[in-house]
Amino acid sequence: MNSLIPIFPLELVLFPESIYLLHIFEERYKKMINRVYTTGEVFGIVSVINSRISKIGCICKVEKIVRTYNKGEMDIYVKGYERFNTINSLINRDGYFESEVEPYFDNKSRDSEIIFEVVLSRFAE
């Protein structure tokens, strides 16, 4: 089943189970974060690479608002949960993207498992 969620494009890659500290300053994203935080909703972070928005992103949730500033800016912790693929996107009346998303599953092969094991062994040396 596909879901429509708010989208936050950023120049970073958010991975499942990772936690990031973000500074929210744009008016449209302050509205989005206030919405998802008060309702407990999830939202998606997609990477912006070379001015292009990725179709693959990570569903996340605001874990904590660390600090709020006089003009409504805020520092927040977000946690990634699972990856998604963007199907359709639109800009809502508050100016931020909302996208219809579906779960994204990596195609795993024996080659990728071998490469992963080699990389891990090099870090263990």
Question: Residue ranges of each PLM-predicted region?
Answer:
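N-terminal low-complexity, acidic/polar interaction/targeting segments
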Residues: 1-125
